[in-house]
Amino acid sequence: PAADGSSFGVSKVKNADQLAPALRVAFMESNEVMIEGFLDGTEISQGIYKTAEKTVVLPATEVVTANEFFDYDAKYNGQVQEITPARLSPETAEEVAKTTSRIYDILHANGIIRIDYIISKDKDGKDKVNMLEINTTPGMTVTSFIPQQVRAAGLDIKDVLSEIVENQF
């Protein structure tokens, strides 16, 4: 589905015979469907917020699941391990943080957002950062990525949200 969230209606298609059933499932969720190539690699998510006074790029979270991809079951039925901070090389962590900040600025984002990436390998075996999606209204439950990242940064979510509201402009 081109809209919605939580990977509702999303399938991983490995051969042509799986395409039609996957499309049927997707169209049950939305009247618009998007097909994209699969990127093999490590999925990470990084939160960021900016106020009139500062930029805070939160520690990235690494997503580890035994499922085919980070699907609904992995997200909501405990079939995932979330590691914050993500196990990235210092160079890759810096590249992701700079990319996250640049995307925030390009979008003229406000408040707190989260950007998901796949870290794949290039032909020389070096990390390649691939932006997957931008979440402008990220989840804020106690187990969501942003609160985890805020805690990993040694911050309190109430203080962060107050800071954003009080110092946005």
Short names for language-model regions:
Residues S7, S11, E43, T141:
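Gly/Ser/Thr-rich beta-alpha loop segments that engage phosphate groups in nucleotides
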Residues P1-A2, E36-F38, Y104-A109:
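Short Gly/Pro-enriched turn/cap motifs at secondary-structure boundaries
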Residues P1, G37, I44-Q46, Y117, ...:
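Generic detector of well-ordered alpha-helical packing
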Residues P1-D4, N77, T137-G139:
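Short connector loops/turns at beta-strand edges and beta->alpha or beta->beta junctions
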Residues P1-P21:
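Conserved anion/nucleotide-ligand pocket segment
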Residues G5-S7, Q81-T84, V142-I146:
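Short small-residue beta-strand/loop micro-motif enriched in glycine and branched aliphatics
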Residues K14-K98, K126-N130:
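Phosphate-binding site of ATP-dependent enzymes
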